[in-house]
Structures are given as C-alpha cells and as structure tokens.
C-alpha cells in the first residue's frame, strides 16, 4: 500500500485499512473539485510565467486538468479512497492522462497551502451564493411590505400586545436584519478570498513564485504576508459560520412568528399548501413543518460554528491534521443556509395574510394606551403623571369590559378633567400609526422611505 501513496517514499509498511477509512476526506472534500482545479490551473500558468515549467508543460497540465473536470462533471470520474483527498485524486488522474509532466504540477506547492487556497475559494463562492439568496429574500419581503403599508396589527413586546404597527413595518424589520447579514457576508468574502500560495508547507519555497498573479487570475483580493499564518488560518471559516448562524437566527425568528401566526389562536396567516404538511391520523391538520424544521435546523449551523471553534482553539503552529475537520461542518452548514434562504423566499412569496383577523386583534390589549398618555402630555401633564393616569383609565376600562375608545367621556373626566372629546380620534389605530413618523418609525412616510431605500439598495 505504501508505494501507492504520493508521500509514501519513506514508508515500508502500508496504511492500515481502518486508518485509511478513518483519515480519508475525499468522501466530502470532493465538493471542492472546481476550486482545486481552478487553483491548479492558475498555479501551472504561473509556474510557466516564472520559468519553472515550460509553456508547453503548463499547457499540457491545464488541458489535462480540464479533462479531469469534464470527467467529474459527467460523473465518470472514479474517486479512490486510497488517494485520501480531492487533491491527490485529481493529481493522480492528471498523471494518468498526461504522464510524468503531471507530476510537475505540485512544484513549489504543499497540500497545506493548496487546501487553504481551495477552501478559501470554496467558502468565498458559497458566501457569495448566500449573499445573492439573501438579496432575493429581501426583495420578496419588500414586495410583501409594499402591499401591506395600510395593514395594521398588534406590535408586541414580551409577546404581549404593545402598540399598533403596520404589517409592512413588521416585515421590513426582517429586511433590515438580512441587509446587515449581507453586509457581513461581503466583509467575510474580502477576508476569505486571499491567496495563500507560496507558503508551501509553512516556511515558503525556494522557487521564484508569484502568488499575486495567481490571486489576480482567481479574482482574489490579495496575498498573505506571513507563510505560517497562510497555512494555519481558518478565521475565514469561523467568520462564515458565524455569519450563517446569524442568518439562521433571523430566519428562525421569522419561522417562530409564522408558526404562531398560523395557529388559529392568532390566525394571522394562511400557509401555502406547498410549504405545509398534514397528519397521519388527524385529517384536519395543516402543520407548519417547513418553518418548524428551519427553526430546528438552525441548531445544525450553530453546531458547525461550535465544532470549528473547538477544532482551532488549541492548535499550535502551523498546519495540523485537525484542520481536515473544517470542511464537513461548513459543507453541512452551507446546505442548510442556502436551502433555508431559498425556501423562506418561496414561502413568504406565497403566504396569505389574514388582514381582517389582524384588524380584530387590534381591539384587544389596550394597544392605544400610549396614545392616551401622549395626549395627556399634550395637555400639559408631565409624562410620568400621564402614565399613571392612563394606567388608571386602562384599569377602569378593563373593569367595565370596554376598550379605551369605548370608555365614556365622564369616566375619563373622572380620572383627569383635561380630557375632552378630542381624545377619541387619537385613540384610533390608524391615528396611532400615522403619528409615528420618526426616522424608522411605523408611520406611512417612514415606511415608504424604508421601502424606497431598500429598493435602491436592491438596484430596482
């Protein structure tokens, strides 16, 4: 077995079968094949420019790598466990195709800087997908908000009725969360897409390499300043997983609200059939399983972040085999984040809002109490006293089983003689919403400004 290993020259005994099974990574890092081939092509061209390879040798290698890529994409490539990982599988097949010239590809390069390059490109590529899926979801949210600027519902704190808000304002809160997420992803991409080539195993190389030209060819933002940092750094994975975790936290919050709102106790939404499931025993059930699963899958992404933090927390310089464990958590998290963003966009696009039920809910919970307190402030009463007087009015209305709009004027005047007939229009939900035109508030002009700003950001 030892002679089959590309590193096996000093070994007399082959790798134990169980060890081979335990240490292989090709079963999952084959996902990086496109980045590995792109990096190797750029490396070969650079070697030719630097006079390490001839132009003819580089062309043969690049053509051979293109053939390997075609085989992989056609499904005819045979992945072999004994070659351990994506890099050695591709290099072995390249050598089968082009002969000994293929063995020159690895000149000036170690798997340490090779895998760092591949994984940086892979994470960057996937983060860019998350970014575009996030932008698509923001667009869906903005479109829904545009249709519901006049739809009002109870805004809550502590899951208790607090103040009336527009449904548009409620939805736009998630758009702004996702915009921050996308900003973070753009920052992450800049730090991930940095070229580590030239570091070799850890100390650099004696060959006259030009990593900057490789970085340019691969659309990277620069090169590393320290070879030891280049091969050992996995900050970019941590950052991407943190960003993915925050995205999932935001999606999970929206899922939680959809789950609650779909319950007849709220009845605010009608879930589309395509995003719900039924019960094997209860024929009437329409379960929000998609939202529940997305809420549950959030933990998988958190787990991936925790796995990576634990993996790197005690590693001495420089590369350690522990770092092989960086790919599975990210690949799993990527599947979850990508699918969740796309599915949430589809679900939100098709969900129907029960605006009549939302309107009815505005009559419970004294959501206009703050309006009464502000009204009293306008009559010259200090806010703390106005707060106390409003509390007394709420208690009286609750005792009588009426809303603040229904409380008779004589009862109001028994609490404060400055209250007059002009209090009643102020207590209407539309009045409460329309008066809140502070920047970012739920007032119509503020909501319209938010929609316009997000439309501009989306390039509409």
Curated annotation (Swiss-Prot):
Classification via Pfam families: ASL_C2, Lyase_1
Single GO biological process annotation from the record: arginine biosynthetic process via ornithine
One GO cellular component term: cytosol
Gene Ontology molecular functions: argininosuccinate lyase activity
UniProt KW Repeat keyword: no
Keyword Zinc-finger on entry: no
Chief localization: cytoplasm
Family matches, as InterPro entries: Arg_succ_lyase_C (IPR029419), Argininosuccinate_lyase (IPR009049), Fumarase/histidase_N (IPR024083), Fumarate_lyase_CS (IPR020557), Fumarate_lyase_fam (IPR000362), Fumarate_lyase_N (IPR022761), L-Aspartase-like (IPR008948)
Pathway where it operates: Amino-acid biosynthesis; L-arginine biosynthesis; L-arginine from L-ornithine and carbamoyl phosphate: step 3/3
EC number: 4.3.2.1
Keywords carried by this UniProt record: Amino-acid biosynthesis, Arginine biosynthesis, Cytoplasm, Lyase
Family: Belongs to the lyase 1 family. Argininosuccinate lyase subfamily.
Coiled coil: none
Protein name: Argininosuccinate lyase
Species lineage: Bacteria, Pseudomonadati, Thermodesulfobacteriota, Desulfovibrionia, Desulfovibrionales
PROSITE patterns in the record: FUMARATE_LYASES
Organism: Nitratidesulfovibrio vulgaris (strain ATCC 29579 / DSM 644 / CCUG 34227 / NCIMB 8303 / VKM B-1760 / Hildenborough) (Desulfovibrio vulgaris)
Catalysed transformations (reactions): 2-(N(omega)-L-arginino)succinate = fumarate + L-arginine
SUPFAM superfamilies hit by this protein: L-aspartase-like
Location relative to the cell: Cytoplasm
